[in-house]
């Protein structure tokens, strides 16, 4: 019989099981993250707009909660976060959205969720941002530039709040198989990373207190995820 193939990345729970709420719970990264967290004994909850997506979340090990960030108040969102140990912002307007929605979802949605976390007393807050977010052209009406502007402004707002935040800025996303190997840096080259590896980075970040108060870019590389995050411990906090 052939030996059992070990997973590329396995999350080991170093603390008690956590309840983690993921906004944008039906996104590809969010579903992959939910499965990793559930397999490690944590309790993921996914916030979704469409109740028809609930079955997909349950299949990934997450409990679905129908809540639209664009139509909900801070108090309503805070109610959904109450009792959680951590919150992940993984929502996105999508590549086909117009400029206005990039601002209302990618910027305003992230800020509203972060403010709701403060109201709910949830200190740990982790953001799916974007590589090069601070390098946008403020005079451009191009969709990508507006997206980067939205991410940059959201990240700045999160950093200003009284939260134990971590902001992760992945490179170009692919659907490749995971490698478990990354490059983590304050600034990295503009290469790509698989969504599966991004999900694994977020799962590890939620276990890694040394990432609190850190903002970094991550792309595919040659360093195991856990080691890359450990090495991040000496990096300076983002301004």
Describe the residue ranges of each PLM region.
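N-terminal Rossmann NAD(P)H-binding glycine-rich loop of SDR-like oxidoreductase domains
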Residues: 18-42
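Conserved beta-strand positions in the Rossmann-like core of class I SAM-dependent methyltransferases
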Residues: 21, 45, 65, 126, ...
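Non-catalytic, hydrophobic alpha-helical segments
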Residues: 29, 87, 168, 198-202, ...
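NAD(P)H-binding glycine-rich loop region in Rossmannoid oxidoreductase-like domains
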Residues: 46-112, 116-119, 207-210
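Glycine-/Pro-rich loop/turn segments that contact NAD(P) or position catalytic residues
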Residues: 93-185
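Substrate-positioning beta->alpha
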Residues: 150, 189-204, 214
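Glycine/proline-rich active-site loop of Rossmann-fold NAD(P)-dependent oxidoreductases
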Residues: 177-180, 205-214
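Short-chain dehydrogenase/reductase
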Residues: 215-223
């Amino acid at each position: 019989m052939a030996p059992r193939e070990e997973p590329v990345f396995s999350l080991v729970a170093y603390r008690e099981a956590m309840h983690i709420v993921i906004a944008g719970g039906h996104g590809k990264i969010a579903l992959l993250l939910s499965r990793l967290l559930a397999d490690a004994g944590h309790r993921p909850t996914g916030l979704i707009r469409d109740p028809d997506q609930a079955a997909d979340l349950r299949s990934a090990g997450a409990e679905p909660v129908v809540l639209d960030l664009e139509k909900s108040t801070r108090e309503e969102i805070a109610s959904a976060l109450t009792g959680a140990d951590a919150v992940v912002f993984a929502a996105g307007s999508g590549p086909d959205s117009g400029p206005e929605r990039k601002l209302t979802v990618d910027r305003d949605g992230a800020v509203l969720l972060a403010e709701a976390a403060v109201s709910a007393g949830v200190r740990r807050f982790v953001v799916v941002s974007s590589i090069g977010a601070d390098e946008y052209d403020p005079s451009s009406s191009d969709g990508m530039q507006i997206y980067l502007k939205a991410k940059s402004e959201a990240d700045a707002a999160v950093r200003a709040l009284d939260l134990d935040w971590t902001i992760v800025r992945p490179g170009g996303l692919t659907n490749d198989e995971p490698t478990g190997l990354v490059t983590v840096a304050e600034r990295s080259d503009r290469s790509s990373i698989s969504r599966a590896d991004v999900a694994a980075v977020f799962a590890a970040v939620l276990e890694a207190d040394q990432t609190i108060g850190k903002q970094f870019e991550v792309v595919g590389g040659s360093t195991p995820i856990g080691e890359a995050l450990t090495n991040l411990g000496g990096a300076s906090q983002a301004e």
